[in-house]
From Swiss-Prot:
This protein's record includes keyword Cell cycle: no
Annotated localization: Nucleus
Tissue-level expression: Expressed in flowers.
Gene transcribed to yield this protein: DUF9
Annotated spans, Disordered: 164-248
A cellular-component GO term for this protein: nucleus
Keyword field: Coiled coil, Growth regulation, Nucleus, Transport
Compositional bias segments (type: Basic and acidic residues): 223-242
DUF724 domain segment(s): 256-425
Species of provenance: Arabidopsis thaliana (Mouse-ear cress)
Annotated protein name in UniProt: DUF724 domain-containing protein 9
Length: 426
């Protein structure tokens, strides 16, 4: 957990793909939905208040977006092909790779001279051409803008192998050069799953096979031919033993609780619909003189049941399907292979169940439709009744208007008589 005032780095994305780490300070820690959240303020790499004020606004992040500030490592000179982090345009620490090392020399006239080799003097300054991993752009950086690439894993900062080897060996060591050349692939920030190295014993065995002398190869070939001959003899013995065992198994499986005396057996056993080899062992508990006839009846019943399954219709009752399944169960006790028909019946039962459910849903929908139609008819009846009442009211309104007109005429006549009477001469 990060307490307020702790310097950290918060992850941010550029163009929704490149992750950069920006220096920040924890302002507040709080818990929301059983998850720790942090209010942080972003700064530049030196934690200065200069620069864009909008970039220093407080932001709320979760714990996965934070990591502590990596420990500072003093580096005299970065090596070629070394993975580093660079602080670019104030956006944060971005992952890159050193592609070229240059030295800049400040002249008295204020001009800058760039040299590929080393330049002695206090006015020289190293700069590095770094390839940004995300954009594949090469940009020049001062050494102060670089730091070794470290990985935060399982709460511990881990240094990449390239930096460890460069710290323990000289820059001119051939071994370190070979290590750097071998590491010219993408940075191993996280281990890639599924990449394994062959066991040491396997490599040694392959090497020995490649370096065997010719005389040893000849002896190996002779021994190989002897082994092949012995293997042929063993295979022949195994075939003979398997034939004997198959014959014994056949004798065992064909032992029936009765003797096949009826000629119909040849016809029954030639049926190729579903070849069967029932044992009829439950018939031991029945009368001996009835066993063969019972077995023949089962042999005749089985293909009939198969045809009955094939002739089933969608409107057959579920009870008929269950009855068929029970018949096959009885035959299974006598050694019939009923897996295929039972599987089909099981599927038909499932479909029949869905059909029954849909029929119930259809009945419910039809019932609702009938109820709504009944309500509609009742509403239409009420509408007709209201229309009839409106027509009667219209007639009454017309009569009232006619009566009112007569009354108005009578009032005018009375007023005229009143005026006539009042103005009559004496």
């Amino acid at each position: 957990m990060f307490s307020p005032g702790t310097t950290v780095e918060v992850s941010s994305k550029i163009n929704n793909k490149e992750v950069v780490w920006v220096p920040a300070v924890v302002i507040k820690e709080f818990k929301e939905d059983d998850e720790y959240k942090y209010i942080v303020r972003v700064y530049d790499k030196s934690f200065s208040c200069k620069g864009n004020k909008a970039a220093r606004l407080n932001k709320t992040v979760d714990l996965c977006s934070l990591r502590p500030t990596p420990p500072s490592i003093s580096v005299e000179e970065y090596q070629l092909k070394e993975y580093v982090e660079v602080f670019h345009d104030g956006m944060g620490w971005r992952q890159g790779r050193v592609m070229k090392i240059q030295e800049r020399v400040m002249l008295s006239q204020g001009r800058v001279m760039v040299s590929q080799g080393r330049v002695m003097g206090n006015l020289s300054q190293k700069c590095y051409i770094v390839l940004l991993e995300a954009t594949k752009k090469q940009i020049s950086f001062k050494q102060s803008d670089l730091r070794p690439l470290q990985v935060w894993e399982d709460g511990v900062w881990k240094m990449l192998q390239t930096r460890e080897s460069s710290l323990t060996q000289g820059s001119g060591d051939e071994t370190s050069d070979s290590v750097r050349n071998a590491n010219e692939s993408d940075p191993p920030v996280t281990p890639r799953p599924g990449i394994t190295t062959p066991p040491l014993k396997q490599i040694e065995a392959e090497t020995q096979r490649k370096t065997l002398p010719r005389n040893q190869n000849a002896s190996v070939n002779d021994s190989t031919r002897e082994n092949e001959n012995s293997e042929d003899i063993n295979r022949k013995r195994k075939r003979e033993e398997s034939l004997c065992s198959d014959a014994s198994v056949e004798d065992t499986t064909m032992t029936l609780p009765f003797e096949k005396k009826l000629s119909i057996w040849k016809t029954l056993e030639s049926v190729e619909t579903v070849p069967q080899s029932p044992h009829f062992s439950p018939l031991v508990e029945t009368r001996e003189d009835c066993r063969e006839m019972s077995a023949v009846g089962m042999m005749l019943t089985f293909p009939c049941l198969l045809e009955e399954v094939k002739s089933l219709q969608h409107d057959n009752s579920i009870s008929s399907l269950i009855s068929l399944s029970n018949n096959f169960c009885e035959l299974e006790k006598h050694g019939f292979n009923v897996k295929a028909p039972q599987s089909r019946i099981s599927k038909l039962l499932s479909l029949r169940g869905k059909q029954s459910m849909k029929m119930d849903e259809l009945k419910g929908a039809e019932k609702v439709t009938a109820e709504k139609e009944s309500i509609k008819i009742e509403n239409e009846r009420k509408i007709l009744e209201l229309q009839r009442l409106n027509e009667e009211v219209d007639k009454e309104i017309a009569q009232s208007k006619s009566c009112a007109a007569k009354i108005v005429q009578q009032l005018e006549d009375v007023e005229l008589q009143f005026q006539t009477t009042a103005s009559a001469p004496w």
